[in-house]
């Protein structure tokens, strides 16, 4: 976050914020200036900005993510279920569980999305409250999951929606690539098809 506050990060189409729970005034201003622009998409997880350095509140999260939320003091399982509906971000995921699906994952406070202007993508498994949603903002798109550990397929769908190159449609294949090499790891050792981009 210090690089963001200094304005020294490159411009990206997609930003993934892995639950920066404590965002001070300078860091909040930097997200507005350097990230929320040029049709970018930002993925937020759990409770981004719940603390501004002096207080903990739902309003702090709303100011950062653009979503209306509520804080629930009762512990909730960090397990969600994706909505069973047609949406480009849910391709191959409709009705699937996500998050921490084994063991005890209860956490408090739980964050619930209450924004009526957002499009719901997922729910808490144990309560049915909204846990994942997307919202078009002024010049950018906000994607928020209050349950972390989104599956790779979700990110693949997001990249597709933003017109980015996808090397493999196989959910069991990991591809690492740059302009010099392509490395492929298949969980099951089966034949797979790799789509090379214009760099090769």
Regions found by a protein language model. Give the residues of each.
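A conserved amphipathic helix/loop scaffold
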Residues: 10, 18-200
């Amino acid at each position: 976050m210090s690089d963001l506050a200094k304005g020294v990060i490159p411009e990206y189409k997609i930003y993934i914020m892995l639950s920066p729970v404590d965002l001070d005034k300078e860091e909040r201003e930097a997200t507005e200036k350097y990230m929320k622009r040029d049709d970018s998409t930002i993925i937020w997880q759990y409770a981004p900005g719940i603390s501004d350095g002096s207080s903990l509140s739902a309003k702090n999260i709303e100011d950062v993510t653009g979503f209306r939320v509520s804080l629930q003091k009762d512990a909730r399982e960090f397990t969600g279920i994706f909505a069973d509906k047609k949406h480009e971000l849910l391709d191959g995921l409709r009705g699937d569980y996500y998050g921490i699906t084994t063991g005890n994952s209860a956490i408090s406070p739980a964050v619930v999305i209450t924004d009526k202007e957002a499009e719901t993508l997922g729910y808490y498994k144990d309560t049915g409250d909204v846990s994942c949603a997307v919202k078009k903002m002024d010049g950018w798109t906000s994607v928020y999951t209050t349950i972390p550990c989104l599956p790779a397929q979700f990110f693949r769908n997001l990249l597709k929606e933003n017109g980015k190159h996808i090397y493999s449609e196989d959910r069991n294949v990991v591809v690492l690539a740059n302009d010099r090499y392509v490395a492929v790891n298949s969980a099951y050792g089966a034949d797979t098809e790799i789509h090379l981009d214009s760099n090769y």
